[in-house]
Amino acid sequence: DGVLLKAVYATVQQSYAGRFFPINDAIREKGLNTVELKYALAIVYDLTGDSSLLDVVSMQDGVVPTHEGEALARDLSLGLTTPFPFKSSLLRDGSNGDQGALAILRAGDARGVAVVFKPTSQGLGHGHFDRLGFLYYDDGHEVVADYGAARFLNVEPKNGGRYLPENETWAKQTIAHNTLVVDQESQFGGDWETGQNYAPHVIAYETVNGIQLTAAELDTAYEGVSLQRLLALVPQPDGGQYIVDIVRARSDTQHTYDLPVHFKGQLIETGFKLDHATSQLTPFGTANG
């Protein structure tokens, strides 16, 4: 059913402003200009003639030295490009599509609003403990960010490239992501093999009266705690989008909850009083990031 073509298009959809979403052990600098995707797009364009792929190729800083690549260069020079349809998508996870999903909500053009919601499977040893986490982009910029992997890539003095110890002690931990932390611990006790056995359940992905929304639940990340999260894009009357984020945790016993938001913008206003650390910064805890 054209699964390879679908895989290429889905790969492009998992990007913003030319860079891939930095989830799990992704390298933040990796993007659409990776050589593997250059070859893939050249082949797909040769098969389909989809002029919107030229829009993606224009972000790749060159074409591959093949007959297919020559056709791309020719058609780019002829001005045959049409905009690539970056769109809202639900990319189901697992071999049977039943291990959660990656939900992408978009509004506007390629540089418009994009919200990425991650109720996915663990992703084996490269997975991070960030179920029900999210990312937010707008106007071509990353607004709510993911740390990605802590790794040297192709750096010869660093043994050719390796993961740093901080990839385990920080980058993979739940606190390094935009999702709820319970009792200052990482999801599944920081054990990926345990996490691999469980996946969130996507309970909504729909558009209602112009409002795009997605929601998921997970009751296995922390013993005795059920987690739910809903994210929505709500159009503003004068243009733009409100981002609505609702997180719910339920348990029969008492717990502490922390909700980190790795925000790269400027905090202007809140509906609650803030405590300010003006003289020194201290760690929130002693372990798990």
Question: What are the language-model segments listed below?
Answer:
Residues 17-26:
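Glycine- and aromatic-rich loop/turn segments at beta-sheet edges
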